[in-house]
A protein has these predicted regions:
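All-alpha RGS (Regulator of G-protein Signaling) helical domain and cognate RGS-like helical scaffolds
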Residues: 2-21, 31-33, 46-239
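N-terminal export signals
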Residues: 26-44
Length: 239
């Protein structure tokens, strides 16, 4: 099958979500030390104690900016679940590990899709996560964070959808958000098994039956708490 070259410069395989082959049990280590945009080593009088200042990453404009925005969120989620599997919380069952491994692999697929699809000249670099607020040895801390990430991801894709101009990208975003919603429901079921929480009123509006849609300007401040690299969505479309 031949690759399709979009006018915007994005290359992808027709009808496929993942232009790269990623196995279900693929285990990729996250290069957390990489800082998007490069790290600036500030000049200081005490050369033995230099200060590393991460450069602010501008996500860009138009559809490319929205794809970079999604790429940033997928980097965050993939890094989080990778750490969860590398350092399982106390009492993690085999069933929980299997589920969380599957979610990790899905997030890696999403991350690698955006990495391959966005032209290198426009693509943001690897982001450095900041998970200091998460206790990875504690089940409640890990699953509570997973719930927050998945709910945020669903709302972010829903909010970004109307900002995407290219129909192909919009379709792909719709496919990804459907998977993210499945993740959100699965995590909620782990926290409160066999309850209505998998699609609770706190996340699905009773009057519309829809998940929330949150604009990038409202999503980024929450995501930034878990990303050491400063992000700027100032140039992203708003309508």
């Amino acid at each position: 099958m031949n690759n399709v070259k979009k006018e915007s410069g994005l290359t992808m395989l027709p009808g496929q979500l993942e232009p790269v082959k990623v196995g279900r049990r693929l285990f990729l280590r996250y290069a957390g030390a990489a800082v998007a945009g490069g790290a600036v080593l500030s000049s200081c009088k005490d050369e033995e104690n230099p200060t590393t200042v991460p450069s602010t990453v501008d996500l860009g404009t138009g559809d490319i900016g929205i794809l970079n925005y999604a790429y940033a969120l997928e980097q965050l989620e993939a890094a989080f679940y990778d750490q969860v599997i590398k350092t399982p919380y106390t009492g993690m069952t085999d069933a929980e590990k299997t589920l969380l491994t599957d979610i990790r692999d899905h997030e890696i697929i999403h991350r690698e899709f955006f990495r391959a699809a966005i032209p290198a000249a426009n693509r943001i670099a690897d982001l450095s996560p900041n998970f200091t607020a998460i206790n990875f040895s504690d089940r409640a801390s890990v699953l509570g964070t997973a719930k927050a990430f998945e709910d945020l991801g669903v709302a972010a894709y829903n909010g970004a959808g109307p900002l995407i101009k290219d129909a192909t990208y919009l379709t792909l975003a719709g496919k990804i958000v459907s998977v993210e919603a499945r993740h959100a429901a699965a995590i909620r079921d782990l926290l409160n098994p066999k309850s209505a929480d998998f699609a609770g009123d706190d996340i699905v509006a009773p009057t519309t039956g829809l998940d929330p849609a949150t604009k990038p300007a409202d999503v980024l401040p929450t995501a930034q708490k878990y990303v050491a690299t400063p992000l700027s969505g100032a140039s992203l479309p708003t309508a």
